[in-house]
Design a protein with these regions (language model features):
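Bulky hydrophobic segments
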Residues: 1-100, 104, 108-131
Length: 131
């Protein structure tokens, strides 16, 4: 509990700083005409989208999210996913509803993890003795 209170400012800075390069990588991956593909048993297009938007939402929520603004962070990431899916059609790729759904589910999962982390009490309860 006490650990969380000490490191929350660092977690917020980390999220805010890493969001921008992560956003650039996601935008590049979605808008490049021939994105690189990894091979393997878990390499599935929808998993890529889920993971990317999970990370973006987690970083943005930890970096800038206060309880009242987390909904706006989530809606902004969802809107970003929609815009990038539309822009894909302009660079010779296919925008898909399945990709948009995977983006949204990833964003929702990232928001859930951020909310769980931010809900951890920052201080020890007053009636507990410190050891």
């Amino acid at each position: 509990m006490f650990f969380h209170g000490i490191f929350l400012p660092w977690v917020r800075r980390f999220g805010a700083w890493l969001f921008w390069p992560a956003l650039a990588v996601v935008a590049w991956g979605e808008l490049t005409p021939h994105p690189p593909r990894l091979e393997g048993p878990l390499m599935w297009d929808k998993l890529d989208h889920f993971t990317a938007y999970f990370g973006l939402t987690l970083l943005a929520s930890l970096g800038w999210g206060l309880r009242r603004s987390l909904v706006w962070v989530f809606l902004g990431i969802v809107a970003l996913g929609g815009v990038l899916e539309i822009l894909q059609t302009m660079v010779g790729r296919d925008g898909e509803w399945g990709d948009f759904a995977a983006n949204d589910l990833g964003a929702l999962a990232g928001l859930g993890v951020a909310v769980a982390y931010l809900a951890i009490p920052r201080r020890l309860p007053a009636d507990r003795d410190r050891v």
